[in-house]
Amino acid sequence: MINNVISPEFDENGRPMRRIRSFVRRQGRLTNGQQLALDNYWPVMGVEYQTEPVDFNALFGRDAPVVLEIGFGMGASLVTMAAQHPEQNFLGIEVHLPGVGACLASAQDVEISNLRVMCHDALEVLMKMIPDSSLSMVQLFFPDPWHKVRHNKRRIVQAPFVELVQSKLKVGGVFHMATDWEPYARHMLKVMTSVAGYRNLSDNNEYVVRPESRPLTKFEARGQRLGHGVWDLMFERIK
Protein backbone atom coordinates (compact mmCIF):
# COMPACT_ATOMS: atom_id res chain seq x y z
CA MET A 1 0.00 0.00 0.00
CA ILE A 2 1.10 3.56 -0.53
CA ASN A 3 2.44 5.57 2.39
CA ASN A 4 1.14 8.99 1.38
CA VAL A 5 -2.06 10.43 0.04
CA ILE A 6 -2.83 13.69 -1.65
CA SER A 7 -5.46 15.50 0.39
CA PRO A 8 -7.64 18.01 -1.48
CA GLU A 9 -8.21 21.58 -0.39
CA PHE A 10 -9.78 24.37 -2.38
CA ASP A 11 -8.84 27.99 -3.01
CA GLU A 12 -11.20 30.96 -2.79
CA ASN A 13 -12.50 30.18 -6.28
CA GLY A 14 -13.29 26.59 -5.41
CA ARG A 15 -10.39 25.21 -7.45
CA PRO A 16 -8.51 22.23 -6.03
CA MET A 17 -5.14 22.72 -4.38
CA ARG A 18 -2.86 19.84 -3.47
CA ARG A 19 -0.74 19.03 -0.47
CA ILE A 20 0.87 15.82 0.70
CA ARG A 21 -0.18 14.31 4.03
CA SER A 22 1.31 11.09 5.35
CA PHE A 23 -0.78 8.28 6.75
CA VAL A 24 1.38 8.39 9.84
CA ARG A 25 0.15 11.86 10.69
CA ARG A 26 -3.47 11.18 9.78
CA GLN A 27 -4.23 7.57 10.48
CA GLY A 28 -4.03 7.15 14.24
CA ARG A 29 -3.27 3.77 15.72
CA LEU A 30 -4.30 0.59 13.94
CA THR A 31 -5.92 -2.07 16.09
CA ASN A 32 -4.70 -5.63 15.76
CA GLY A 33 -7.92 -6.54 13.95
CA GLN A 34 -7.55 -3.68 11.47
CA GLN A 35 -3.94 -4.59 10.76
CA LEU A 36 -4.88 -8.24 10.30
CA ALA A 37 -7.64 -7.28 7.87
CA LEU A 38 -5.24 -5.12 5.87
CA ASP A 39 -2.68 -7.91 5.75
CA ASN A 40 -5.16 -10.61 4.75
CA TYR A 41 -7.87 -8.88 2.72
CA TRP A 42 -6.25 -5.91 1.00
CA PRO A 43 -4.75 -8.22 -1.67
CA VAL A 44 -8.30 -9.40 -2.44
CA MET A 45 -10.44 -6.27 -2.04
CA GLY A 46 -7.93 -3.42 -2.11
CA VAL A 47 -7.37 -1.32 -5.21
CA GLU A 48 -4.06 0.47 -5.72
CA TYR A 49 -4.06 3.93 -7.25
CA GLN A 50 -3.12 4.18 -10.91
CA THR A 51 -3.11 6.97 -13.45
CA GLU A 52 -5.08 5.02 -16.05
CA PRO A 53 -8.88 4.53 -16.11
CA VAL A 54 -9.97 1.39 -14.31
CA ASP A 55 -11.88 -1.39 -16.07
CA PHE A 56 -14.79 -1.99 -13.70
CA ASN A 57 -15.83 -5.23 -15.39
CA ALA A 58 -12.35 -6.64 -14.84
CA LEU A 59 -12.10 -5.22 -11.32
CA PHE A 60 -15.33 -6.85 -10.13
CA GLY A 61 -15.36 -9.79 -12.52
CA ARG A 62 -18.78 -8.88 -13.88
CA ASP A 63 -20.84 -6.14 -15.54
CA ALA A 64 -23.05 -4.44 -12.93
CA PRO A 65 -23.95 -0.88 -11.86
CA VAL A 66 -21.13 0.79 -9.92
CA VAL A 67 -21.70 2.87 -6.78
CA LEU A 68 -18.81 5.04 -5.60
CA GLU A 69 -18.67 6.20 -1.98
CA ILE A 70 -16.26 8.97 -1.02
CA GLY A 71 -15.04 8.99 2.57
CA PHE A 72 -16.65 5.87 4.05
CA GLY A 73 -15.24 6.33 7.56
CA MET A 74 -15.12 2.95 9.31
CA GLY A 75 -17.14 1.40 6.49
CA ALA A 76 -20.16 0.09 8.44
CA SER A 77 -22.77 1.72 6.19
CA LEU A 78 -20.88 0.88 3.01
CA VAL A 79 -20.63 -2.79 3.94
CA THR A 80 -24.33 -2.86 4.85
CA MET A 81 -25.28 -1.36 1.48
CA ALA A 82 -23.08 -3.81 -0.41
CA ALA A 83 -24.62 -6.73 1.50
CA GLN A 84 -28.16 -5.49 0.87
CA HIS A 85 -27.56 -4.88 -2.85
CA PRO A 86 -25.59 -7.82 -4.25
CA GLU A 87 -26.73 -6.81 -7.74
CA GLN A 88 -24.54 -3.69 -7.56
CA ASN A 89 -20.79 -3.16 -7.37
CA PHE A 90 -19.43 -0.81 -4.69
CA LEU A 91 -16.13 1.08 -4.66
CA GLY A 92 -15.26 2.95 -1.48
CA ILE A 93 -12.51 5.53 -1.01
CA GLU A 94 -11.13 6.51 2.40
CA VAL A 95 -7.83 8.20 3.28
CA HIS A 96 -7.67 7.00 6.90
CA LEU A 97 -6.06 3.59 7.16
CA PRO A 98 -7.88 2.40 10.33
CA GLY A 99 -11.17 2.96 8.51
CA VAL A 100 -9.98 0.93 5.54
CA GLY A 101 -8.92 -1.88 7.85
CA ALA A 102 -12.22 -1.82 9.71
CA CYS A 103 -14.16 -1.86 6.44
CA LEU A 104 -12.21 -4.85 5.13
CA ALA A 105 -12.79 -6.76 8.36
CA SER A 106 -16.53 -6.05 8.27
CA ALA A 107 -16.76 -7.05 4.61
CA GLN A 108 -15.15 -10.39 5.33
CA ASP A 109 -17.43 -10.97 8.33
CA VAL A 110 -20.50 -10.82 6.07
CA GLU A 111 -18.73 -12.57 3.17
CA ILE A 112 -19.48 -10.08 0.40
CA SER A 113 -17.65 -10.04 -2.91
CA ASN A 114 -19.12 -6.91 -4.55
CA LEU A 115 -17.01 -4.37 -2.64
CA ARG A 116 -13.59 -2.90 -3.41
CA VAL A 117 -11.78 -0.22 -1.40
CA MET A 118 -9.09 2.38 -2.03
CA CYS A 119 -6.87 4.38 0.31
CA HIS A 120 -6.14 7.51 -1.70
CA ASP A 121 -7.38 11.03 -2.36
CA ALA A 122 -10.84 10.76 -3.90
CA LEU A 123 -10.38 13.84 -6.06
CA GLU A 124 -7.37 12.35 -7.79
CA VAL A 125 -9.09 8.99 -8.16
CA LEU A 126 -12.05 10.70 -9.82
CA MET A 127 -9.84 12.65 -12.19
CA LYS A 128 -7.49 9.83 -13.20
CA MET A 129 -9.09 6.44 -12.56
CA ILE A 130 -12.86 6.71 -12.95
CA PRO A 131 -14.01 6.54 -16.58
CA ASP A 132 -16.44 9.20 -17.75
CA SER A 133 -20.13 8.27 -17.63
CA SER A 134 -19.41 5.03 -15.74
CA LEU A 135 -21.08 5.40 -12.32
CA SER A 136 -24.69 4.79 -11.38
CA MET A 137 -24.32 6.68 -8.09
CA VAL A 138 -21.81 8.75 -6.16
CA GLN A 139 -22.28 8.91 -2.39
CA LEU A 140 -20.80 11.58 -0.10
CA PHE A 141 -22.04 11.11 3.45
CA PHE A 142 -21.13 13.45 6.30
CA PRO A 143 -18.04 15.12 4.82
CA ASP A 144 -16.09 17.53 7.00
CA PRO A 145 -18.25 20.70 7.15
CA TRP A 146 -15.34 23.03 7.98
CA HIS A 147 -17.51 25.05 10.34
CA LYS A 148 -15.45 28.25 10.51
CA VAL A 149 -16.23 30.75 7.77
CA ARG A 150 -12.57 31.21 6.90
CA HIS A 151 -12.35 27.46 6.31
CA ASN A 152 -15.49 27.14 4.15
CA LYS A 153 -13.32 27.16 1.02
CA ARG A 154 -11.92 23.80 2.10
CA ARG A 155 -15.28 22.08 1.79
CA ILE A 156 -15.18 19.36 -0.83
CA VAL A 157 -18.57 20.35 -2.27
CA GLN A 158 -17.61 23.18 -4.62
CA ALA A 159 -18.68 23.77 -8.22
CA PRO A 160 -15.56 22.24 -9.84
CA PHE A 161 -15.93 19.08 -7.74
CA VAL A 162 -19.65 18.83 -8.53
CA GLU A 163 -18.90 19.19 -12.24
CA LEU A 164 -16.26 16.46 -11.98
CA VAL A 165 -18.73 14.12 -10.29
CA GLN A 166 -21.28 14.87 -13.00
CA SER A 167 -18.82 13.85 -15.72
CA LYS A 168 -18.30 10.47 -14.04
CA LEU A 169 -22.00 9.70 -13.56
CA LYS A 170 -23.99 8.05 -16.29
CA VAL A 171 -26.94 10.06 -17.56
CA GLY A 172 -29.61 9.11 -15.03
CA GLY A 173 -26.99 8.51 -12.34
CA VAL A 174 -27.42 10.15 -8.94
CA PHE A 175 -25.18 12.20 -6.66
CA HIS A 176 -26.35 11.54 -3.08
CA MET A 177 -25.05 13.70 -0.21
CA ALA A 178 -25.88 13.84 3.48
CA THR A 179 -24.77 16.16 6.27
CA ASP A 180 -25.73 16.85 9.87
CA TRP A 181 -24.63 20.50 9.67
CA GLU A 182 -27.45 22.66 8.32
CA PRO A 183 -25.24 25.51 7.03
CA TYR A 184 -23.31 22.94 4.99
CA ALA A 185 -26.61 21.51 3.71
CA ARG A 186 -27.57 24.98 2.49
CA HIS A 187 -24.13 25.35 0.91
CA MET A 188 -24.52 21.99 -0.84
CA LEU A 189 -27.94 22.96 -2.15
CA LYS A 190 -26.66 26.30 -3.44
CA VAL A 191 -23.70 24.73 -5.22
CA MET A 192 -25.72 21.90 -6.75
CA THR A 193 -28.39 24.29 -7.98
CA SER A 194 -25.74 26.46 -9.64
CA VAL A 195 -24.40 23.63 -11.82
CA ALA A 196 -26.31 22.90 -15.02
CA GLY A 197 -27.08 19.32 -15.98
CA TYR A 198 -28.46 18.14 -12.63
CA ARG A 199 -32.06 17.67 -11.50
CA ASN A 200 -32.99 17.88 -7.83
CA LEU A 201 -34.95 14.75 -6.88
CA SER A 202 -36.64 16.56 -3.99
CA ASP A 203 -40.34 17.34 -4.39
CA ASN A 204 -39.75 20.87 -3.13
CA ASN A 205 -36.34 21.36 -4.78
CA GLU A 206 -34.56 21.26 -1.43
CA TYR A 207 -33.90 18.09 0.58
CA VAL A 208 -35.14 14.51 0.40
CA VAL A 209 -36.18 12.15 3.17
CA ARG A 210 -33.40 9.70 3.94
CA PRO A 211 -33.88 6.86 1.45
CA GLU A 212 -33.85 3.28 2.70
CA SER A 213 -30.75 2.74 0.59
CA ARG A 214 -28.73 4.83 3.08
CA PRO A 215 -28.45 2.94 6.37
CA LEU A 216 -29.04 4.85 9.59
CA THR A 217 -25.76 4.99 11.50
CA LYS A 218 -25.50 4.63 15.27
CA PHE A 219 -24.13 8.17 15.48
CA GLU A 220 -27.03 9.50 13.40
CA ALA A 221 -29.63 7.62 15.44
CA ARG A 222 -28.18 9.03 18.66
CA GLY A 223 -28.25 12.52 17.17
CA GLN A 224 -31.88 12.14 16.17
CA ARG A 225 -32.80 11.16 19.72
CA LEU A 226 -31.16 14.41 20.83
CA GLY A 227 -33.11 16.37 18.25
CA HIS A 228 -30.28 16.85 15.77
CA GLY A 229 -31.17 17.04 12.10
CA VAL A 230 -29.71 15.35 9.03
CA TRP A 231 -30.16 16.65 5.51
CA ASP A 232 -30.05 14.40 2.43
CA LEU A 233 -29.66 15.76 -1.09
CA MET A 234 -30.07 13.70 -4.25
CA PHE A 235 -29.39 15.10 -7.71
CA GLU A 236 -29.72 13.20 -10.98
CA ARG A 237 -27.49 13.81 -13.97
CA ILE A 238 -29.83 14.70 -16.81
CA LYS A 239 -27.36 15.55 -19.57
UniProtKB/Swiss-Prot annotation:
**Cellular component annotations (GO), alphabetically ordered:** tRNA methyltransferase complex
Q: Do the record's keywords include tRNA processing?
A: yes
Active site per UniProt: 144
Which GO molecular function entries does the Swiss-Prot or TrEMBL record give? tRNA (guanine(46)-N7)-methyltransferase activity
Instruction: Indicate which residues the UniProt annotation says bind S-adenosyl-L-methionine.
Output: 69, 94, 121, 144
Q: What is its EC number?
A: 2.1.1.33
Which reaction is recorded as catalysed by this protein?
guanosine(46) in tRNA + S-adenosyl-L-methionine = N(7)-methylguanosine(46) in tRNA + S-adenosyl-L-homocysteine
Q: Which UniProt keywords apply?
A: Methyltransferase, S-adenosyl-L-methionine, Transferase, tRNA processing
Which pathway is this protein engaged in? tRNA modification; N(7)-methylguanine-tRNA biosynthesis
One of this protein's Pfam families, by short name? Methyltransf_4
Region: Interaction with RNA; residue ranges are 150-155
Fetch the PANTHER family from UniProt: 3-DEOXY-D-MANNO-OCTULOSONIC-ACID TRANSFERASE/TRNA GUANINE-N 7 - -METHYLTRANSFERASE, PENTACOTRIPEPTIDE-REPEAT REGION OF PRORP DOMAIN-CONTAINING PROTEIN
Q: How does it assemble?
A: Monomer.
Family, according to the entry, reads as follows: Belongs to the class I-like SAM-binding methyltransferase superfamily. TrmB family.
Role according to the record: Catalyzes the formation of N(7)-methylguanine at position 46 (m7G46) in tRNA.
Supply the name of the protein: tRNA (guanine-N(7)-)-methyltransferase
